[in-house]
């Protein structure tokens, strides 16, 4: 009896625990459904009309450009990149293709280093070669620093970042010494001051750039990042700078998007704080104010997906992809949404994820998402086999 009594007591406790677990799970499921309905109810009605792109079609292909670099086809790279830059000098709206093309080099891929150095050595008077290497070095600087808070980042990491930035600065200086009309080079200089300088340094770099090319969206959008509150600016400054830019909107319709940047940043802050409904509201306001800008849709699409509203999220991500193709973040979220259980388009999700890797190289979350998609594909294959279809 002395042995049986504790056993009986344990059985009673296990039943109690099991019952409690069932109750808690039921409550969580009910709360989840209730919260989902509540979140949906709080989101204002979203109306999506036909897209009105603010830029000409983006035709630069980052995958092809990266492949040409690996093949050391410097003549083809020179012809491709300078053709985009020449078009932008004749029509500032074409600077979007310049940004897209040179972004192909903005990845911390060790395999890029040697061919870029070789290209610069072979063609010291090529602004395209210098700018391509600058993009790479700035990406390496970000990789060296890492994404953690400054208090969690070592002095060695900061030193490596500074070394890459210094090397990149030399390449930008060389670029502008050969061709002072390259807006992408000015944007990198402004970004450098944003990270390592002050608000005043950032504005000085921006003013010098805008003196040369006042209708550039590339220059003005990078300046807007300097004016964000997290970098010592304010939303009032952002709105004022956006309003001033409208003087040139007849030359470059893309400048209209700047009017939505303050609300876009508000949305980003809400998104980062897990406040997805307010984020959606701010992103929607940004679209209403600034028009069809890819980042606005990408931000809103992410917020929708974090609320498990994947159909809405996918619609926004597809719009972002149409407006600005080959963006890694857009492709990643497309893969995530397409692989959601209720969507189940895992083959399509895998294609988007593969393109993201081709565009920007692998990254930690990509491996996790890939494993999930592959697992679901395998399960789907087993289910199909079991059903005899």
PLM regions: where:
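Juxtamembrane low-complexity tails/linkers enriched in Ser/Thr-Pro and polybasic
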Residues: 1-10
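N-terminal Sec-pathway targeting helices
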Residues: 9-21
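Hydrophobic membrane-insertion alpha-helices, especially the h-region
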Residues: 18-30
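Hydrophobic single-pass membrane-insertion segments
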Residues: 30-40
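Short coil/linker segments at helix-helix boundaries
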Residues: 56, 60-68, 75, 82-125, ...
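TPR alpha-solenoid repeat register
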Residues: 129, 182-185, 219, 255, ...
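Residue-level signature of tetratricopeptide-repeat
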Residues: 131-133, 189, 223, 259, ...
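Terminal, low-structured helical/coil segments at or just beyond the last alpha-helical repeat
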Residues: 244-247, 350, 355-389
